[in-house]
Amino acid sequence: MSTNEEKKNVLFGSENQPWQQIISDLGIDSELQVSPPEQDSCCTYDQIPGISCRDFQLSPKGLTPEQRQTALQQLHEYQSQQQKYFLGYQTNQKLDYEDDLKRYLNFFLNNLGDPFQSGNFTVNSKFMERAVLDYYAALWNARWPHDPKDPESYWGYVLTMGSSEGNLYGVWNARDYLSGKFLLDDPDAEEDAKQASRDDQPRSVPRRLIYQKTRPPQDNPNAFTPVAFYSEDTHYSIIKAMQVMEIKTFYELGTELYPDENPLAPGEQWSKEVPSENGSAGSGSIDIEKLVKLVEFFAAKGYPILVCFNYGTAFKGAYDDVERAGKALMPILEKYGLFERKVHYDPAHPGKYDIRNGFWFHVDGALGAAYMPFIEMAYNAGQIKHRRPNFDFRLPFVHSLVMSGHKWIGAPWPCGIYMTKTKFQLRPPDEPEYIGSPDTTFAGSRNGFSAMIFWDYLAKNSYKAQIEKALYTENFATHAYQKLLELQEKLQLDLWVEHTPLSLTIRFKQPNPDIVFKYSLSCETLYVYQEKRQYCHIFMMAQVNNQLIDELIADLSQRNAFPEQDTRISQPSNEIFVAKEAKKLLQIPHTGRGFK
């Protein structure tokens, strides 16, 4: 801990002045109004090549135009350099929005609340958002336009975050739907207002909504306890969403309540996640046969089922076969009364109930949902030999779907789309005395600029243009894969080169830190063939060209490109004792599995 005198003398800002001097020059009593730095943050934070930490520190005096320009020039040079060699993540760096949209940077555009309710905050782009949502509803085979009176029509919105927000919202929607919750008007709201008025306190009657949860039947205490399933290649945002929404996974329930009944390996520990095909060495797609066994175990005990599928996993770019999985699970759900069931919302009136599914299938299509429809079009036109399985609303068992806008499409910031059907929103029943309002977007304020970005991109790019772009990126993925295989042969070194069919990513042995930084490579530890391996991957997005791949291959050809790795799997050095009654908690990975 620094002394007060040391704190006051910490150098700060581009002029390298002591903090106390800066504060004193402004006539501020630093003891009462602002706290000094505990230490020099430029020595604490990561140092970025090409960036002067001092030039970016925000002095209480502000920055002069010259200082600001110096910092911004460094910023531009750094970002331009990193963008030029960007290969490691699934984001399109080839953007074209400046000419059309730069004039709107001085507008505060807020798509507040539901996109289908214009509202009184009129500086918004909801009319553009609705056009974007209709576009993707058509592309994903949903019924459109949105019609609140048509339960089969789509509902959705443009996300302010990436697909992480959509995954969280989808899991939230699924939890409330499966746990038998209803959104109702509070019948006491009007009575409260009447009572206040009798006391000469004029009071409006605000619409006050309450959540009500139905009670499970006596013969099935598990009827409204959802259990979640997702593969070991699932993005961590899904796993975090389960924790935030307090949804138990099959691993948690199995370990806690059925420790010796693991259907995949009786008597052995439960898997934390549904295994992927061939484990870490496989493509990354969910193992459907094992999923079916796990789901049937819990369906037989009356639990409603929540399955999160992937369509373009973050690290391997794998696609779950949603159609085959759904068809395999439907007979099980029908067998145990989970295909459709009555959900009563008024114990006093048995005739008041909803008919709901006892399952929810969510598709995380952060990457694949943006471009696979165009691969399908190319396949149908005979332009490509293969396509991936269906994943969208043509499958009657799909409840919700998310896609990121900053990945294959390309955007200056994270954004995305969440879509479901109107009938799956948490809505009040139809009887007048119970009418509330539909549950709507996750965030109140939403970035209106994101809808404009989507609209501008789609207005410039026809289906034909996007088919050409999809084929370009697919062909480049095959090209880069072959180049890495040739390098492996040339070096006579196993580089662990792997490529999931029709994915845009190629993974290989992690090179040295300089190469990782230059190309912004995403790295991850995988346990493969009884070895602990450090992998990295590259994504073939629209900005990638032959010159960039050739330069990467040249760098990887250098003698010190691939440091030796210790692939031995070490045992824990300290034995950890856990009390018998301690519960096993959900495991959330903090590294790897890409990003949203």
Where do the protein language model's features map onto the residues?
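N-terminal entrance/gating region of PLP-dependent enzymes' catalytic architecture
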Residues: 2-154, 165, 533-539, 543, ...
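A short small-residue
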Residues: 109-115, 309, 453-460
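Short glycine/serine- and small hydrophobic-enriched flexible loop segments
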Residues: 137-138, 172-176, 455-460
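Conserved PLP-enzyme active-site core in the AAT-like
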Residues: 153, 158, 162-169, 173-427
